[in-house]
Amino acid sequence: MVSAGFINTTDIDTTANQTNIISTSTEIVSTSTIKTKDNVASKVKVYFADAPIMQKIAYCESRNRQFDKDGSIFRGIVNPRDVGVFQVNERYHLADSKKMGIDIYTVDGNLEYARHLYESQGTQPWSSSRPCWGNYEKLAIK
């Protein structure tokens, strides 16, 4: 689920007993409301309906978490540079994800970048969690 809202800003100059409107702007702001594990799991299931192995990988990597309970990005325990539901590593992938216009810190962006990795490299980027999802490898398309 994605919600959108408007933010109106007005800059006002109140010097010398005058009020002058300097500028006014309106921005459309979109925020993802997918915060809970269940909602993330549902989103992963729909997004990777054609690649069920990725649903297993998301569970094994993060237990379907994009965010911690305090709302901060979920980071890996072994490597805190692994972020989000697919534990995309900042060191290896942040620059490329930014070049592609993908924000790996959002649910949608993390899934989109995981799709990119899967389509270009198969399940290899998640080989460290293979003991968890490897029994389901027959679900893999690549």
Regions found by a protein language model. Name each.
Residues I22, I28-K142:
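Catalytic glycan-binding domains that act on GlcNAc-containing polysaccharides
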Residues A4-K35:
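N-terminal, intrinsically disordered, polar/charged segments of Gram-positive cell-envelope systems
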